[in-house]
Amino acid sequence: IPFGVLPDKVLVNGPDYGLGLKYVLEEVGPSLRYWKLFQVKADPSKGDIILVLLPYWDRTINNILNLIKQIDWPAEIVIKFHPTVEQSKYTSQIPSKFSVTDKDLYYLFGRARMVVGQSTGTMVEAASLGIPVINIVDPEKISHNFMPEFGRELLWSSATHVKDVYRLVRQFEESIRLDPSQLVGMGEKMRNNYFCEPTEETIVRAFGLT
């Protein structure tokens, strides 16, 4: 490679993250950071919480907290802040009927009936486990949507206003009631498209350790 500027190989998390590079070898590599995603099982039909995953942008946090307070949810609201956020700044905005947790994300996925949030890759992880995801969009600000096109309107969807959230809650509750296995099946397909299990075989192959 001239000047040694380009890498010999680029590893991506999954087949659908392909960059279409012309001059550099591109391969799917093990998703080392997401190894727990392949260990946990989720069943939204048995979920007993609505998991709210907050990003680290102040305006976005305020928008989500303001919106979720206006919804009559079908399960307990459990809020997980981004680890870089000072939670005490938002205490006054969280009703006593909601709870805040610092428990392991994958433990919470195992209890989740739905996941609500914005601009965080953890929502892709949730959908990959077959958990319905509501992506909150701020109408007055550019929103970073990490969700892939796959599963839109079936496994995940975006909401801007309270009425949008209510519609999606009803839709996802019906999906959970009628055919939760379909959600799990779509989740498995998403996981296979966007993540690669870090097994000994995939690690050896990706890093040429043979």
Q: Where do the language-model regions lie?
A:
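Short, acidic/turn-prone active-site loops that include or flank metal/cofactor-
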Residues: 16-17, 31-35, 102-106, 138-142
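C-terminal alpha-helical cap of glycosyltransferases
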Residues: 177, 192-210
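Helix N-cap/beta->alpha junction signal
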Residues: 13-16, 83, 119-120, 161
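Conserved catalytic-core segment of nucleotide-activated headgroup transferases in glycan assembly
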Residues: 26-93
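Active-site and donor-binding regions of nucleotide-sugar-utilizing enzymes
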Residues: 1-37, 123
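Donor nucleotide-activated moiety binding/catalytic core segment of transferases
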Residues: 83-129, 133, 140
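Catalytic binding pocket for nucleotide-activated donors in carbohydrate/polymer assembly enzymes
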Residues: 5-7, 23-24, 28, 94-95, ...
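Structural motif
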Residues: 9, 49, 113-114
